């Protein structure tokens, strides 16, 4: 019997990659587990399913007969969450709880996608899964609450924290830099926030590997290597062949230019320790993943 998979936020950066990888049976990294052969995927966005409506979620999951639920639905605008924490809490915390209860009721597995922003980012050492959390923003607080609710309500739950995600669809930092780089001679980017740029293709690959096991709990899943946003921007300009200089600034300078911006962790690099210890860490070095992305992007945008 082929597996039935529900992906919420199904047409977002991650949802899109999950759909394609499941169709093709492989990612840019390589083949996915045989358990997914012939899998049926239901990609639900807000039009199909309001994840904040507990009753609707329970009914949708029960009727769908799903084996696996991947929650890619989130309010990810970090600055926007700061001024709308109630709305962010509904989507980032209550909705995962709804999905977790629904998955538990039908015996399905749940993957709750989370973020490096659950950490304070005060220590310049990559975080492992059981390091103490301490979010400094509304986005981080609401996502941490979503992790807690998911793990509490579903016994077959994986929490997968990622960071600085970019995919072939939708808006992301890489596409923004390419757009600005084509128009401008220079762009100003912060140089004192460090983390891991992550390809949605790599993340989707590892999520499918993890979810084929019963090693439940928290995982970190980012591309390998730590850089600043300015380093990331420079790599994009170089890789896309754009003649645009990256001017480096501090978070303080950025905040002065953008007063509504949320506080962000200074150092939120993650170490994929649990992956290393279980299914194996196949996440590519971030520059390799970015090169592949830039090569594939014209064809993907077709």
Enumerate the predicted regions with their spans.
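NAD(P)H-binding glycine-rich loop region in Rossmannoid oxidoreductase-like domains
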Residues: 51-91, 102
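Catalytic helix-loop patch of NAD(P)-dependent Rossmann-fold dehydrogenases
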Residues: 90, 94-98, 109, 118-160, ...
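Mid/C-terminal beta-alpha module of Rossmann-like enzyme folds, strongest
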Residues: 206, 213-260, 294, 301-302
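C-terminal amphipathic/interface module of NAD(P)-dependent oxidoreductases
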Residues: 263-302
